[in-house]
Amino acid sequence: MSNCINDDTVYMMDFKGLENILIDMDGVLLDTEYDNYFWQKHIPLKYAELKSIDTDQAIKITHTLFNFKKGNKDWYDLDYWSNMLGLDVEKEKLSDDMINRIKLKKGAIKFLDKYHNDKNLYLVTNAHRKTLNIKMQKFPLMNYFKMLICSHELRHVKEEIPFWFILRNKLGIDYNKSILIEDTIDNVKSAYHAGLRSILIGDSLNYKDMPCFNDLSSFSSSLK
């Protein structure tokens, strides 16, 4: 059972003095079904066709490669995987079947509408720029944000502590007046070491030592 705070829980967060909201994309604004299906099912099927092998063998090969790179910048790099697998990964992501799987999470637009005028919103994602562009074609959220940051371009991923120091310098913001909204605990932990507070979003999370909400809708309803 999740310990995330829900709409029925009395929880108020004071936004007084808060200037900057750093927001993750996948798992916070967008549902992760698109990415999960793409890497776990779609790419193995295409790899099986390319190599003329059975699907189970293709799944074993591709998932082994993915797991080996998980947590570093290659894992998010479409060009890396195109070269590694011999597939045009960007083209596969642009197929109609895949584009139709990109979906907004509950409360995403309402949250952005509510805060983009009086707070500095920054999209901070591990997604490759090509992946970000594909998703922004489906849901053009760019104008809500002061800047769209892809970790790959800072040569570190969000799981790595140096990323957050480099990001702070790039944005020129005070982390004491900022908050991160994330769905990945490893990213929250690394951000903490740079002095950045976080809110966890996710219906399966189970952390008692920090604010945790099922989605942006329940988080927004808790704010003063």
Predicted features by range, described:
Residues S2-I21, D113, H128-R129, N133-K224:
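Asp-based, Mg2+/Mn2+-dependent phosphohydrolase catalytic module
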Residues C4, D8-K110:
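N-terminal helical cap/lid subdomain that shapes the substrate entry/recognition surface
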Residues I21, V89-K103, A108-F139, S151:
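Substrate-recognition element of Asp-dependent hydrolases with the DxDx(T/V) motif
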Residues D31, L123-T125, L200:
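Hydrophobic residues in well-ordered beta-strands that form the structural core
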Residues K51, Y115-K119, A194:
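Helix C-cap/helix->beta junction micro-motif
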